[in-house]
From Swiss-Prot:
PANTHER family: MICROFIBRILLAR-ASSOCIATED PROTEIN 2, MICROFIBRILLAR-ASSOCIATED PROTEIN 5
Organism: Bos taurus (Bovine)
PTM entry text: Forms intermolecular disulfide bonds either with other MAGP-2 molecules or with other components of the microfibrils.
Protein's recorded name: Microfibrillar-associated protein 5
GO biological process, one term: definitive hemopoiesis
Entry annotated with the keyword Glycoprotein: yes
Disulfide topology: none
Gene name of the record: MFAP5
Subunit structure: Interacts with TGFB2. Interacts with BMP2. Interacts with FBN1 (via N-terminal domain) and FBN2.
Signal peptide: 1-20
Hydrolase in keyword set: no
Amino acid sequence: MTFFGPKVLLLLTALIMSSGRTPLGVSGQRGDDVTTVTSETFTEDPNLVNDPATDETVLADIQPSTDDLASLNDKNTTTECRDEKFACTRLYSVHRPIKQCLHQICFTSSRRMYVINNEICSRLVCKEHEAMKDELCRQKAGLPPRRLRRSNYFRLPPCDNVNLQGPSGL
């Protein structure tokens, strides 16, 4: 049983790999010698052509229908959205390698540095969302909703847990 030790298995593996034969299921491809694979035709009908799609045919297939365009136009007119740009400056903490030399001995250490990234971000702001945010702020402040303001209707805000008993003196 000592014949099948780890040294013999390692030797057999080296012999198989050096002989140019590869075990089943292993392909010896590198990134630079990959060949292109042609697609096979799975139909026997000679009228069907299996040519790769060109840019014109792909773009012709993707054109939206008139129903899609109408729904997009309706959506844009009802929501009244705008693209709002704002500054979103971020502070990043990174480790940068610093090379320090004393006479002829050099060593590299990594120090934490802070990088400020000034960016301009954009977000889509819709009129409906702004109205909903205003309504939530009014409710949190304890004010009545705008549509019921003149009818002397007052309700407690549903967002907050309001203690109706008040603080106890104990």
